[in-house]
């Protein structure tokens, strides 16, 4: 519970502008881990130089961060939020679990840079994301997806 509270202390700036923060998260994910861009068919034709400020990337990034906000505010009681997300990401999008670990680290960096998240907050976010990803992976296994 303390980890969720530690992260939520820094969530305000992100919540105030999901679109720009989300665009930054996905753009950085695609630049640092180019293989992840292939998992998003609607973004495969976008050149790296054109990613920053791309409306579609920013919109999807906002969706990602809004969902993360829901998970954070649930403070661990997130089964009802996570199950449909696990279902779509396993059965429809086929997103390997490792990609959630990659984006988690990008989110930590963006939170540090843009929301002033300190070392304690960064560790708390890593702890929260590890717990969420473990639960996501358990859902994947139930669905028979070994991503």
UniProtKB/Swiss-Prot annotation:
Protein's organism: Sarda chiliensis
Catalysed reactions, as listed in the record: Fe(III)-heme b-[protein] + nitric oxide + H2O = Fe(II)-heme b-[protein] + nitrite + 2 H(+); H2O2 + AH2 = A + 2 H2O
UniProt: O2 binding residues: 60
GO molecular function annotations of the record: heme binding; metal ion binding; nitrite reductase activity; oxygen binding; oxygen carrier activity; peroxidase activity
Protein function: Monomeric heme protein which primary function is to store oxygen and facilitate its diffusion within muscle tissues. Reversibly binds oxygen through a pentacoordinated heme iron and enables its timely and efficient release as needed during periods of heightened demand. Depending on the oxidative conditions of tissues and cells, and in addition to its ability to bind oxygen, it also has a nitrite reductase activity whereby it regulates the production of bioactive nitric oxide.
Binding residue positions for nitrite: 60
Ranges of residues in domain Globin: 2-141
Chain ranges passing through the membrane: none
Protein's UniProt name: Myoglobin
